[in-house]
């Protein structure tokens, strides 16, 4: 897996469309390679690449007990579109062939066939496999995935000239995660959520305290449902939004870090519904 520099047809390219590919060149000219971090919990390697007039600093990070490799990209992009449109992509070769790809969409996921065009995915693309683990590619900020029989790709930079002639020049910071999962929609959603929501922390000195070493505001137990948002309401309550990921009926159990006096089901407009809700 790695970066690929593409030249695409200007006539069929725009800010919204990736044009017909004319040339694909792997970004493999590594001018510097160094160990960034060496430790029991985290190890990383940083590689510096040159591509045409641009440079890419790529850090590969592997952390303890993590199933995905984190790829931190810092690209100084200087390419300008003219007769051809320069495009930078990430390509993940597959060890198997497939024509089914799962992508997350608002309030769920969808499975699409492989086509020679980018399709939208909010945070991840997954190349589904009938037997065995499925390759998954997660992004923090890019949405144009392309599933093909033997690869799972993601467009990172598209230097189109329409409508803006200089849209992408400058420093781009992008984080990707590459790994494997079972192919289950809920597991993929949990993986993408975990990757994109870092732990917030506050350093301090050593002292005594009354709070437990670990706690949680809310957690969910469900076969196929996930939490998508937790927010306060105007009347002082807590609103928990969620969705079912597989198109099935699924019971949901929410556990809070405090006593719950009352609970009710509401729709997207916070109107009360008749769905059964129990508290204990």
Put a short name on every predicted segment.
Residues 1-280:
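C-terminal (or distal) subdomains of carbohydrate-active enzymes
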